[in-house]
Amino acid sequence: MQIVTSPSELRALRREWKGTVGFVPTMGALHKGHLTLIQKSKAQNEKSIVSIFVNPTQFGENEDFAHYPRKPEADANICQKAGVDILFMPKAEDIYFEGDEVLLKAPQKSGFVLEGAARPGHFDGVLRVVLKLLHLTSPTRAYFGQKDTQQLLLIQKMARELFLPYEIVPCPTERDSDGLALSSRNAYLSEAEKKEALKISASLKEATKHIMTGELQSSQIKERALKVLEGVEVEYFEIVDRNLMPLERIIKGETIILVTARVGKVRLLDNLWI
């Protein structure tokens, strides 16, 4: 495995490869969910690139950029054992130029609801860095987890509308044995908070149970699910279509249920595709 920090070195190495290339962009603090993406890339491509970059432009002023977990040595070891070909670990000054003027704006509707409403400017930063990383790595396929559903859908939209020649591959959410969606931020949780956080996935199970028994009215499903979340600080629990617009009734094959809540100081996301 080669560890690369320079965009020019990455592009030079990439030009030497003629076969299929998979790309897994991450912010580090790698866990089993990331490893699943890497394994999928390895299985579907001749070469695989992983990036680790805590992107400053997707964090707001009062968010946890400075405290986001960083484990470069452990992450490099995980990538080495997984058979990654190139680990790209740039610094902010390698990705962004002083006085950058060519910016990217998230879609006015789907980019400023849900996470976009809670974190203004977040998806501008996400799309900007993902586009840069895709151009630097020129992958055949790029892998993104469904846990960050809104991010995934917006990246797919960007790829489609900008005619990017890269396949965006969605990958199912990985969970621990209790059902908690894996996240780098789980490291912040105490044992008591981890138990409390299980209410998040439990609320999705509750919603599924009622849908399976024939309840299709979104308001009724939401009401029942929110009872499971009592005691947790819920930011939103929404039932939307694939364009992230609200649905009054469940449409199987077109519905996503998204929940975001705070447990202690930790903000956690989860979702269910129906």
Swiss-Prot record:
One of its GO terms (cellular component) is cytosol. It is found in: Cytoplasm. The keyword Ribonucleoprotein does not apply. ATP binds at residues 27-34, 145-148, 182-185. It catalyses: (R)-pantoate + beta-alanine + ATP = (R)-pantothenate + AMP + diphosphate + H(+). Its EC number is 6.3.2.1. (R)-pantoate binds at Q58, Q151. The keyword Glycosyltransferase does not apply. Catalyzes the condensation of pantoate with beta-alanine in an ATP-dependent reaction via a pantoyl-adenylate intermediate. Belongs to the pantothenate synthetase family. This is Pantothenate synthetase. It comes from Wolinella succinogenes (strain ATCC 29543 / DSM 1740 / CCUG 13145 / JCM 31913 / LMG 7466 / NCTC 11488 / FDC 602W).
